[in-house]
From Swiss-Prot:
UniProtKB keywords: ATP-binding, Glycerol metabolism, Kinase, Nucleotide-binding, Transferase
Protein name: Glycerol kinase
Annotated GO CC locations: cytosol
Statement: the UniProt record of this protein carries the keyword Kinase: yes
Length: 499
């Protein structure tokens, strides 16, 4: 396998990306293309599935060409993707019968309430690890079957195929030869039993979704089959699939029970590897499958924060306090601390572990001495505080004391935020050299399947440290900071609950 590389396809919510990795896990070339966001009604979010495919195929070819290579240089392809986003297509034509309904879409919220009223919540959580929510794929499939003309009849005839974005890409890369998904994506549908590792007939019946629509569920790292498209002249093994947060956990090499990563993006996604047994959360976290390699399954606890880096965008676009995101660190550093100011950025409610949809953004502790720098500091602090709330819930659920926090995503470049995160969590925040951990995770899963890398131990040895942030704030100050945050959260909830 001299001079061969792994191609990782990272199909995200706003863009399709492709990256070529070498044997040491270094990025050799990249390509990226944004695509259209479709908002037919308030609360509805859609993508054009054909555009998802065309942009992803385009950047795959571009990344390889940019590196001066062709398909013969690629040992395998790994796919990682935005999760839960739902596509239904006609098996005979290969054409979608409706746009992709995106994970953010809330059109099925009322239907989810009906399912809860029927008493299904406990059963769904016990089987799938998930709460009943429009976030997940199941109710989106049901909406398409109920609202697209002729869909129900075609489904009964076995003509319709459902897939998350990974399934759609594999279907197109193999010209309809493979209709598959992996366990991580299946575990986000609200239809997959994470204990038996099978589609759940009882849930399919409750939601009136024909089993014939569903893809075959495979491991996250195995050779599924070769590409058959004209994107590449030669056939390349498709060999790794994982949802974006699962791939990031693997790319961060959080392969042991109790290891945790936090991706600081627009929101924050915190995931803890819990080993070979699923842990049912008592603290409003989601239980999910981390990945499957061979027969080995790893489970995870996950907590999502709605507003992470988005709070910095609000300071820029909403308040005009900063001109660009990079300025926030300089402004926030100009004061020694937030001076008692707390920002609860519940612009769209509060996510894990609070799950309060009615809460709204609130600013506390403001005096005549409060400056834009204090507000900037409070905004950065809020990202760290929300992360601590989730991490403490993970510790409570798992009974595992977190040893360190591995960090990635755009906002982890902010040294002030990372230091404060370490301070109030009381453990090191560790930033890797390769920041593209999601794509790297997909590459690793594919490379393992084809023997490009020998085993996980070899991958562990590749993980390189950029910077370690060690707690430095005295315990009394940490306690005072956290007590103030808890008061702010209580007050924000009280504001939401007061008529």
């Amino acid at each position: 396998m001299q001079d061969q590389y792994i191609l990782a396809l990272d199909q995200g919510t706003t863009s399709s990306r492709a990256m070529l990795f070498d044997r040491l896990g270094n990025i050799v070339s990249t390509a990226q293309k944004e695509f259209q966001q479709i908002y037919p009604r308030p609360g509805w979010v859609e993508h054009d599935p054909q555009e998802i495919w065309s942009t992803q195929a385009g950047v795959a070819a571009e990344a390889v060409t940019r590196a001066g290579m062709n398909g013969t240089s690629i040992a395998a392809i790994g796919i990682t993707n935005q999760r839960e986003t739902t596509i239904v297509w006609d098996r005979e034509t290969g054409h979608p019968i409706y746009n992709a309904i995106v994970w953010q879409d809330r059109r099925t919220a009322d239907f989810c309430d009906q399912l809860k009223e029927q008493g299904l919540e406990e059963k769904v959580r016990a089987k799938t690890g998930l709460p009943i929510d429009s976030y997940f794929s199941a109710t989106k499939i049901r909406w398409i079957l109920d609202n697209v003309e002729g869909a129900r009849e075609k489904a009964k005839q076995g003509r319709l195929a459902f897939g998350t974005v990974d399934s759609w890409l594999v279907w197109n890369f193999t010209k309809g030869g493979l209709h598959i998904t992996d366990v991580t994506n299946a575990s986000r549908t609200m239809l997959f039993n994470i204990h038996s590792l099978k589609w759940d007939d009882e849930l399919l019946e409750a939601l009136d979704i024909p089993r014939s629509m569903l893809p075959e569920v495979r491991a996250s790292s195995e050779t599924y089959g070769p590409t058959k498209t004209t994107v590449f002249a030669s056939k390349i093994p498709l060999a790794g699939i994982a949802g974006d947060q699962h791939a990031a956990l693997f790319g961060q090499m959080c392969t042991e029970s109790g290891m945790v990563k936090n991706t600081y993006g627009t929101g924050c996604f915190l995931v803890m590897n819990t080993g070979d047994k699923p842990i049912e959360s008592k603290n409003n976290l989601v239980t999910t499958i981390a990945w499957q390699i061979g027969d080995q399954i790893n489970y995870a606890l996950e907590g999502s924060i709605f507003i992470g880096g988005a709070v910095v965008q609000w300071l820029r676009d909403g308040l005009g306090i900063i001109r660009n995101a990079a300025e926030i660190e300089t402004l926030a550093r100009s004061v020694p601390h937030c001076d008692g100011v707390y920002l609860v950025p519940a612009f769209a409610g509060l996510g894990a572990p609070h799950w309060n949809a009615r809460a709204r953004g609130t600013l506390f502790g403001v005096t005549r001495g409060t400056s834009s720098a204090h507000i900037a500091r409070a905004a950065l602090d809020s990202i760290a505080y929300q992360s601590v709330d989730v991490l403490k819930a993970m510790e409570a659920d798992s009974g595992i004391r977190i040893g360190e926090l591995r960090v990635d995503g755009g906002a982890c470049a902010n040294n002030l935020l990372m230091q404060f995160q370490a301070d109030i969590l009381g453990v090191d925040a560790v930033r890797p050299k390769v920041s593209e951990t999601t794509a790297l995770g997909a590459a690793y899963l594919a490379g393992l399947a084809v023997g490009y890398w020998k085993d996980v131990d070899e991958l562990q040895s590749q993980w390189k440290l950029d910077r370690r942030f060690t707690p430095a704030l005295p315990h009394a100050e940490v306690k005072a900071c956290l007590d103030g945050w808890k008061r702010a959260i209580r007050a924000a909830k009280a504001w939401a609950d007061t008529p």
